[in-house]
A protein has these predicted regions:
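Conserved adenylation A10 loop of the ANL superfamily
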Residues: 1-8
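Structural motif corresponding to the C-terminal cap of alpha-helices
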Residues: 23, 27, 96-99
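Phosphate-coordination loops involved in phosphoryl transfer and adenosine-cofactor binding
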Residues: 30-31, 108
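Active-site glycine/GP-rich loop and adjacent strand/helix microenvironment
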Residues: 60-250
Length: 250
């Protein structure tokens, strides 16, 4: 049985504001027209969470969700001159693949995604369809912890600034509770500093990451940066070594 997470309205408000900070850092600008294509309903949180987030930005919002045909989605995007897409990669790709022949695609400036990485094939498909938009992360977050990280324009794929006023991040050795040095991958544990109704303390998110071993980010933000390296269940563990996906040459 899944466990329930409860939040007060004040906690949800702070989470929405922090998500908005992340979207602003990722490149959403005042005056943008944002299509919220996150999945609504079925106890899914992202649609509501990001709808609350964009309300704190000076943008217009089109709440498309995913209960639509590709033809209808493109119709509304073109009618309201959408220039930013916010959603799961698979849902945005589905619109492209299921669009009727001869469909007109809007010129999109920015695609902010969440949930899963955008691999090279889908990335090329989206850039060809929507006029070479910039693809960014909408933020590193989970239903349990809320926002954990955000990307600025200087973050490479998989790298994030820590939401350090909301989270304490520990990166520990794979097989012990010892902290790893900067640049070495380890297990990521988060302690949420906001939630009081259902506290989240040293939560093992299941991701492997490493601290970015560089000086202060060129964007000027002082929050520490980390980079995702994979999942703990993606590791190959042997008697004398442990291999992460990033260490394997395809």
């Amino acid at each position: 049985e899944p466990r329930s997470c409860y939040r007060t309205s004040e906690e949800q408000h702070v989470i929405a504001v922090r998500l908005a900070w992340g979207l602003d850092a990722a490149g959403i600008q005042p005056g943008d027209v944002v299509a919220n294509m996150m999945p609504p309903g079925n106890l899914w949180v992202p649609f509501i969470s990001y709808l609350g987030a964009v309300e704190h930005l000076d943008v217009r919002v089109l709440p498309i969700g995913r209960a639509y045909s590709a033809e209808a989605a493109l119709k509304w995007m073109n009618r309201y001159k959408v220039n930013v897409l916010l959603g799961y990669p698979a849902e945005i790709v589905r619109v492209v693949l299921e669009a009727p022949a001869g469909s007109t695609f809007p010129q999109i400036r920015l695609i902010a995604t969440s949930g899963t990485p955008v691999y090279e094939g889908p990335k090329r498909l989206l850039q060809e369809a929507f006029g070479n938009p910039r693809l960014v992360s909408a933020g590193y977050a989970s239903n349990d912890t809320g926002p954990m990280g955000y990307q600025c324009e200087h973050c490479t794929t998989g790298a994030f600034h820590l939401q350090d006023d909301l989270q304490i991040l520990e990166i520990l050795e794979i097989d012990s509770d010892q902290p790893v040095p900067k640049g070495k991958p380890g297990r990521m544990l988060f302690t949420q500093l906001l939630l009081r109704v259902v506290p989240v303390i040293r939560y093992a998110i299941g991701d492997i990451g490493k601290w970015v071993d560089e000086d202060r980010c060129p964007c000027g933000r002082r929050s520490p940066r980390f980079e995702l390296c994979g999942r703990t269940d993606d590791m190959l563990v042997g008697e004398a070594l442990q291999l992460l996906p990033e260490t394997l040459d395809a």
